[in-house]
Amino acid sequence: MTYPFLLRWSSPLAAAALLLAPIAAAQAAAAPAGLTGNAEAGKAAFRKCASCHQVGPSARGGFGPKLTGVIGRKAGATTDYKYSAAMKNANIVWTEQNLAGFLKAPSDFIPGNNMRFWGIGNAQQVADLLAYLRTQ
């Protein structure tokens, strides 16, 4: 007797789905739920980011990649910055949820990336930064 609802480990697709489901759930849970970001507060908070990143029409990559239009962009996709292999191979799009998870703990979210930053523990500050980045 066969049970079509049972997944077989011999199916690579089924195995991948089971293994990746917890990662996807963790990334979705990383968003600062229920918080409304303030773009002006985010602009002020971005001053710390500006030591490595630029935004705006004349932004370019330097010590870190430019962040203009980062929301909705594939990770590791701009051509003016030399990304780590980990970032190039992350195969994610910078949704607000993914950015929130990355800003909270960059090295945990994408192990082996080049960002030398401990992360932001304040969920409101993350929401504010996302609100500001939405305007860029």
Task: Give the predicted meaning of each segment.
Residues 93-136:
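C-terminal capping alpha-helices of c-type cytochrome domains
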Residues 18, 80-82, 110:
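Short, basic/glycine-rich phosphate-binding loops at helix/coil junctions
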